[in-house]
């Protein structure tokens, strides 16, 4: 049942053990996914859209998972559960209202821009071409970085596997004591190299957000002369566009992280298999090491093949979103609606504000640390 999955996810978000892992984005995603699922499933909405039930299940799971972990986690439970359930209730009530507001906003914008429809369409088209020119090198760079760092990971791990093979040949009679440190180190090197891989690739998405801001700002300036009386409404639509585009950047970052973690999961069992074979004969261990090398090649190649095209896919999604804006602002927009993206943006803004307020309150309540006592100066040497 989707409700239980959401509740469990929300509980786990708050009890991952490290405070840095509890983020506004995680909480907002859980609430938004819950709202979206119920909106798409009328039967489940009728059966389970009960605020009291949601609160009870959240509290029960928080209590079950948290126990007496720490004061921070307990405070988070007390504040987060009511806040999350209130947000969900507000989403349900605000959806239709916001839908009507966005419809009227677009009607006014279209009416104001209609005398300049060709110029507006041309300006947005120019912006699309500039966006494509900007993003093209980033897609190529992502592909290059994926290839470079994936190959670095493969070489690094293959080199360590080859060292283990050399030690095996030299210490056939004393395998366990000779190779155990290498096997343990190999597992650690998998984790280390995967984290380094993510560290090199995930900043790509943050750089794209900067380019998105630049592109949307240029679009705003180019359209401003045609929207002098409705500038605020145009700005609102462009804020929605930027939100959607940046959401794609976050999804790209998540895909990079997920693929890297999946690569780690695929490599770890083979490394563990080598370690377990230390108790067996040299032939069995040699076969495991040979399999390890071929397994490394296959898995790294699959990682590279899966992740390489993501940059191009991301670029196409952004271009499509700008094209959709052109259609919405044009005279033949029809019944295009996008109020849900504004609803989600408002949700995430509220969750961010909630966490900022919570952090400020926590800092105010925290006692000041006493200054360290200075050591008395020693006697002067005569």
From Swiss-Prot:
Signal peptide location: 1-20
Region (13 X 22 AA approximate tandem repeats): 33-330
GO molecular function, one term: cholesterol transfer activity
Keyword Transport: yes
Gene3D superfamilies linked: Apolipoprotein
Region (Disordered): 362-382
Sequence repeats: from-to residues: 33-54, 60-81, 82-103, 115-136, 137-158, 159-180, 181-202, 203-224, 225-246, 247-268, 269-286, 287-308, 309-330
GO annotation, biological process: acylglycerol homeostasis; cholesterol efflux; cholesterol metabolic process; lipoprotein metabolic process; phospholipid efflux
Record bears the keyword Cytoplasm: no
Pfam annotation, one family: Apolipoprotein
Record keywords: Chylomicron, HDL, Lipid transport, Repeat, Secreted, Signal, Transport
Major subcellular site: secreted
One CC-aspect GO term: chylomicron
InterPro entries: ApoA_E (IPR000074), Apolipoprotein_A1/A4/E (IPR050163)
Compartments, as annotated in UniProt: Secreted
Subunit (UniProt): Homodimer.
Recorded family membership: Belongs to the apolipoprotein A1/A4/E family.
Function: May have a role in chylomicrons and VLDL secretion and catabolism. Required for efficient activation of lipoprotein lipase by ApoC-II; potent activator of LCAT. Apoa-IV is a major component of HDL and chylomicrons.
Free-text comment on this protein's domains from its UniProt entry: Nine of the thirteen 22-amino acid tandem repeats (each 22-mer is actually a tandem array of two, A and B, related 11-mers) occurring in this sequence are predicted to be highly alpha-helical, and many of these helices are amphipathic. They may therefore serve as lipid-binding domains with lecithin:cholesterol acyltransferase (LCAT) activating abilities.
Entries under PANTHER family matching the protein: APOLIPOPROTEIN, APOLIPOPROTEIN A-IV
Protein name per its UniProtKB record: Apolipoprotein A-IV
Organism per entry: Felis catus
Gene transcribed to yield this protein: APOA4
